[in-house]
């Protein structure tokens, strides 16, 4: 599994959709999630522009955090949606919410169904806990809390797992064909070996097993190569795989990856 440790997330893999493409559709940057029509138009145009046979949703890694109360600044001509002021003083303040009930998520779900009905294979990018927390609280504070009161962070991770699992169920019902799990802010280079291992064992592995069961035959699960590297370093990668021993590892934003017939790695 050494190939995963060599994977780097380049700037071109970070950008979900270009401001120029949004502008060409006559949509204001701050309105990318304002309507189902806007979402479907952007996703379809981005798919066609990249030569993909799938539509990629959402267009940022902030949707789940916003549903949980994060202050998310809207996209503009220079950048996509991003975190504003921090809203949590402590990870233990994370509220239990229904992600699918938030306005943006609800429109994304309807857009997923509309894109599917329009002949698109829909790939939905599900964000992990560190990416979510990074929108709501300083990561330095998260690690301090994790060190002093690990049970507080553990309880927050349990709540996150429940919320994201319920959202996965709704995504499957909406007709999403692939769920791509990634945690850009939670890779081993940022967390370090101690917290990387804790996150893998406390959240990532049990969560992937849980949503794999939720997906069943309705939806395929993909994991980011950076997440795969974290699982692999602890010897957990195959434990996250289905009983047959295969797991799909793929960067959905990297050209050619989803087109490959060999994206299932043993």
Segments from the language model and where they lie:
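Active-site-proximal loop/turn and secondary-structure-junction residues that shape catalytic pockets
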Residues: 60-61, 128, 185-187, 225-229
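Conserved, mostly hydrophobic/aromatic
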Residues: 47, 115, 164, 171, ...
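Active-site-proximal, glycine-rich beta->alpha crossover segments in alpha/beta enzymes
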Residues: 70-167
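Surface-exposed amphipathic alpha-helices with a cationic face
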Residues: 112-117, 172, 208-216
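N-terminal basic, low-complexity leaders that serve as flexible interaction/assembly modules and, when applicable
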Residues: 1-76, 197-222, 231-266
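Active-site-proximal loop/short-helix segments
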Residues: 123-145, 174-200
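Short beta-strand segments at enzyme active-site cores
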Residues: 55-58, 122-125, 176-183, 218-225
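Glycine-rich, proline-tolerant flexible connector loops at the mouths of alpha/beta enzymes
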Residues: 54-74, 92-100, 178-197
